[in-house]
Amino acid sequence: MTACSTTPTTSATSAQPAAGSPLQWHARPSKSDTLPFEGAWSVQAIQELLDKPFMDLMFQAQSVHREHWPAGDIELATLLSVKTGGCPENCGYCPQAAEFDTGVKAEKLMSVDEVTRAAQAAKDAGATRFCMGAAWRAPKDRDIEKMNELIGAVKGLGMQTCATLGMLQPHQAQSLREAGLDYYNHNLDTAPEYYQDVVSTRQYQDRLDTLKAVRGAGISVCCGGIIGMGEAPVHRAGLIAQLANLNPHPESVPINSLVRVPGTPLADSEPVDPLDFVRVIAVARITMPTARVRLSAGRQQLGDAVQALCFMAGANSIFYGDKLLVTGNPDVEADTTLLRKLGLSGTRTSVQE
């Protein structure tokens, strides 16, 4: 496994809460915010990290990173949309929502042969994890059966598998696990108090309920969020608090920079400050020391220099390939060149104790 359940050494920079706490979202942050278990990260503490002098924050994040991960190790993951468009949800950032005019056409679920060919191409290009996304609100049991076939085909190539399919029931998560699924992605997107500004067709607790079902089935969790949706700094701190206080924290944490797609409600959002994005990466590393922190959507708009800072801040995974679901991504040659210039290697290792 890429990031295992190894318990990290507790320190002032990488404290983790005790196991067994329920998944629930925390109250609106305030100076008197009381979190549900001893050792949890408060929103205020995370905000203080985000506000640290940049060089001090980078040093702390890189120090935590080297305590738990080999220097220069970057996981390469590929993401494929196996069922595109037509989603009944109204996520303000997503071009696959049926109600938005973004030019994305609804397509049926891809065949086993199509997915196998795409996975083999990703493996040949150096990817070690293959992620499959389907634009469903909540898959039906018959959809899960079809996904199980795709999971089996990709596992047969010797790759790790990840899926993002929407909200799951516990029995569906168990079925995916029995098919061999390694990771399930279900992002929290933002802080709970800002969530309804982004999407109104579901509740924050719906996300946490699916994460609970995934954990209960024994599937590793991939869960992160999006920066640049008009949120305030406290909402960024609130997102990281939610992620870091999941018990245990996610094995993979994808951090996205909003891709402003014409036709979506968030298309006119102000671009995120690049250094603010790097700060989020650094604090994610400090608060979730054994997670794979993944640079996800929006890497094209960051540029090489900012990506290099993100790697220094503790990012150790990227989505690899020229397309992420329906948005662009740096091509393989560009990523290979960047990693080579930085002396980084696209290999897969486990967390260090």
Curated annotation (Swiss-Prot):
A molecular-function term among this protein's GO annotations: 4 iron, 4 sulfur cluster binding
Organism from which the protein derives: Delftia acidovorans (strain DSM 14801 / SPH-1)
Enzyme Commission number(s) from the entry: 2.8.1.6
UniProt protein name: Biotin synthase
Family: Belongs to the radical SAM superfamily. Biotin synthase family.
Pathway it works in: Cofactor biosynthesis; biotin biosynthesis; biotin from 7,8-diaminononanoate: step 2/2
Keywords: 2Fe-2S, 4Fe-4S, Biotin biosynthesis, Iron, Iron-sulfur, Metal-binding, S-adenosyl-L-methionine, Transferase
GO BP terms: biotin biosynthetic process
Cofactors that this protein relies on: [4Fe-4S] cluster; [2Fe-2S] cluster
Xref: PANTHER family: BIOTIN SYNTHASE (PTHR22976), BIOTIN SYNTHASE, MITOCHONDRIAL (PTHR22976:SF2)
Entry-linked SMART domains: BATS, Elp3
Residues that hold [2Fe-2S] cluster according to the record: C131, C162, C222, R294
Chain positions covered by the region annotation Disordered: 1-30
Domain Radical SAM core: 72-299
